[in-house]
Amino acid sequence: MQSAINLNIGGLLQNTGLLRNSRNGINRKPLDIEATAASLSRVYHQVWRQFSSDTSSPVTINQMNNILRDSTLSRRIARKSEISLNYDDAVVRIIPASSSFYIQRRGFRTRKQTFGVGNAGKPTQDEVKSPLTYFSELLAGKKQKTSEGGVEKWNQYESDLKKLPENQQRTYTDGFVKGLLSNGVSGAGKDGKKSNTLTRFYIFLVFCIFFGYLTGRIRVRVGDRQIGSLFFSNPQEVNPEDVQVTFDDVRGMDEAKLEVEEIVDYLKDPEKYSRLGGRLPKGVLLVGPPGTGKTLLARAIAGEAQVPFFHTAGSEFDEVLVGQGARRVRDLFDKAKARAPCIIFIDEIDSVGSKRVSNSIHPYANQTINQLLSEMDGFTRNEGIIVIAATNRVDDLDKALLRPGRFDVRVTVPKPDLAGRVDIFNFYLSKIVHSGGIDPKVLAKGSTGFTGADIENMVNQAALKAATDNAVEVTMAYLDEARDRVLMGPARTGGRIPDEEANRNTAYHEAGHTLVSLYTKDATPLHKVTIIPRGQSLGHTAMLPEKDSYQLTKAQMLATLDVMMGGRVAEELIFGDDKVTTGAADDLSKATQLAVQMVKVFGMSDKVGLRDFTAQDNESALVKVSDLAPQTAELIDAEINRVLQESYKRAKVILETKKKEHQLLAEALLEYETLSADEVKRVISGQKIKRPTPAAVKKSNETKRNQPSLVLHLFEEEGRGKQ
């Protein structure tokens, strides 16, 4: 009986011991603490004395009073929490602040019933059980739900107790109970209802914060930058004083600079134009191929205008949630209105301003562009705001976006001409250390078709290569190598591939391209030919125009087709039809595209006629439906095949009549790996190339690397002999 009593003593106070370990005390009156502890200790002590076989309790009332007083200092008990004890189908809840007991019972498929005992409830007499009676039932047979660890400890206690003599069992039991009371026993019931409520509240709070951050309603500032949401970046305002780019840094686009300089002048002195009745243009659209300097021009406007400047990208308006794209547009213009006069720059506007479509799958797809149209020129005018946008796909923009009143000025930024390239080379060469023998005009003539970004990359690549070689300055040789890198791609560092049979095939293939280009009247002039792998190709034949080309003739396009066919024809003539390789795949693809354009777009077929058939090609449609008659489609295919076959025959005639030159050029490529246009002409005329072969250069370099160690060895031997 004593062991059962001691066990239930530990079960009754296990939660009290746990709460006593977390001392989050608050300011409470000492008298209240003493009264609460005393009321609980009297009840517990009365229970123990009633059901103890021995008159003396293993725990004195003073010890219980101290434990309960410490537990009352807990923040949870101070906030009228409760101690829950689970027993089978019942829960005993003890509220220390009011010395009240609650007994809850839940049967199978019955609702929860709550009974109160103490100051906090007024239950009927039939529904209430006395706490002492309830505890006696527990001690009589019902077991308390404990954790697996508590059961194991109790089993160990019973086993150890039976091994001890009777005179030592009482002392062992007293020590076990005191340790249980001081450290607490795990597995106590907790305030589940309050814990669940707090957990749900915290989850709801975290969800609200995350959703607000997701949609941009809650904004976080990181340093000087304000981040609106996780997925939707905000338009960034640029401080004009922080922009170091001016119109002096913009080279090779004089006409475009003149257009935007008028807008900057208007922002600086609006009265100069308003007194004559002029109004500020609503928008400026920068149109041009990639790399021509559209974004650079926008940076220069920000540095010259000295007004608030907002920049964003068209892709930033694409939102995950419906309606967020339109909200982003409204937020952008709201910020701009507060800082007017100002400039808004939207890069790659084709992402948001493309043509509107009727899509039943996504009926809200046009909300963003509709909001942009309304903000630029809707019912409410936005005075003092200029929208500058850049795109290289102007044909994809919606017509409503291009009308006057929205984009009043369209500025074309083309590739630089010869004078523009000279100006750009002078600008970037001034930023590096180079030799005095570099002529920017020569570089400009040899870089026809280069954009400003290509020239910047070319000069930078030359400087990096010179630094890698520990050179004192950048020479013309480094610039030529960098130009080839831009034109043909990076070369394989190890030179030609180790497969000599593949190198031989590549040499005859590239020699075929080269000879056809040399003996075709309107072909683009040859620049360089190589069998060193560059990029995805095993070899490359580079063409470089002598002057800027603004349009192409039919003869020039046919000559280009002939040059493309030269590689495949060379393989067939040298190795046979069964030994042709896949090296001509890219040539055939480009030749087919050019032939299709000649027949379907440019009207260069007499049988097809002067008609554009590209209107039938709707690449964005899920199902392509052609309005062409079957006879017309067959005629177009026949004409495309005819153009390609005639080009193949012309290339074959050239290579059949130039077999000797073809053989000499292929052998020279196998020996020297790379040949310039002048060297090619010397080879086919029977002259020798006056430079060492790559194999000789490699051998010489190996000799030089071994020479210092040999000299050092001789020096050591000589010094050893003198000793």
Swiss-Prot record:
It comes from the Eukaryota. One of its GO terms (cellular component) is m-AAA complex. This is ATP-dependent zinc metalloprotease YME1 homolog. Its main location: mitochondrion. Zn(2+) binds at residues 509, 513, 587. Disulfide bonds: none annotated. ATP-dependent metalloprotease that catalyzes the degradation of folded and unfolded proteins with a suitable degron sequence in the mitochondrial intermembrane region. Plays an important role in regulating mitochondrial morphology and function. Pfam families: AAA (PF00004), AAA_lid_3 (PF17862), Peptidase_M41 (PF01434). Its cofactor is Zn(2+). The chain crosses the membrane at residues 198-220. GO terms for molecular function: ATP binding; ATP hydrolysis activity; ATP-dependent peptidase activity; metal ion binding; metalloendopeptidase activity. InterPro entries: AAA+_ATPase, AAA_lid_3, ATPase_AAA_core, ATPase_AAA_CS, FtsH, P-loop_NTPase, Peptidase_M41, Peptidase_M41-like. NCBIfam families: FtsH_fam. The keyword Heme does not apply. PROSITE patterns: AAA (PS00674). The keyword ATP-binding applies. CDD domains: RecA-like_FtsH. The active site is at residue 510.
